[in-house]
Amino acid sequence: MDDNVLRVYDSILGMLSGPENPTPLVRLNRVTPYQHTQVYGKLEWYNPFGAVKDRVAANLIADGEARHTVQEAQKLVEPTSGNTGMALAMIANAKGYSLTTPLSSEVPLEKRTMLRFFGADVLELQDTLCPAPGAPEGAIAKATEISERPDYLMLNQYANEANPEAHYKTTGPEIWRQTQEKVTHFVCGLGTCGTITGTGRFLKEQSESVNVLGIHPQEGHDIPGVRSIRQLQQTKLFFPDEYDGLIEVTNQEAFDLCLRLNREESLIAGPSSAIALAGAFKLVPDEPGNVVVVIFCDSAFKYASSVV
């Protein structure tokens, strides 16, 4: 019996977030430059496996099961910069599947260690930090090669509509309800673009006046989980015409704000959370009535060695 009030669940999968079991919204009080605009972080590390990608992994698998492409004892393969892989590994464990994940050796040690700890078969490759489509020796190419074997399935978070659908069904409704329908700006770092696409579409359907803002890192960045403009051209879920704003944040801006979030707000936010917040500060004006929600993708625990 799942009970979101008493927080009693039949299995760990019952803890996956949704409109009746949302991840928290926490107002920022010390790092914001505003007098009037209210800024909230949506703390996605409260998902059971620690990141916003838990939503995506769960829906990718559920969609595959519904389509009967995910079979009993299925062998899954997925290229990742860490968070999707960790969520897929743990959900696979709960359902009797297995996961092979090709990834870059530049992915933080904490993530690579946890993937192995969770039971994934980790294949470290000489790839860019975020898997690069078109790289013949990269993680995406390796996963595609493995998926051609008859006993493997690649869920393909970079093109699968089940990715944004997860956020259309959960993240968007959560934010609309948690802000009592008052959200004016939704801000998100760009990786696969599933979060901004699904959440943004839902919020725009509720009110066309909601501003959807996408934040990307500089070229040559070292922030896992987000993609530069050049890298974004490769994901099939990047729809910039649907955004009201798009802006770049530097490594230094992201890492500096990451430290401030931890040390001044006592929020254990990672660098991909900070990059989204830094972009919000650049794009959102200080006006009465502004209610800004920024996706804080995951915690700093997986990045401490690379931030400090």
Task: State the predicted function of each range.
Residues 1-308:
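PLP-dependent amino-acid enzyme catalytic core
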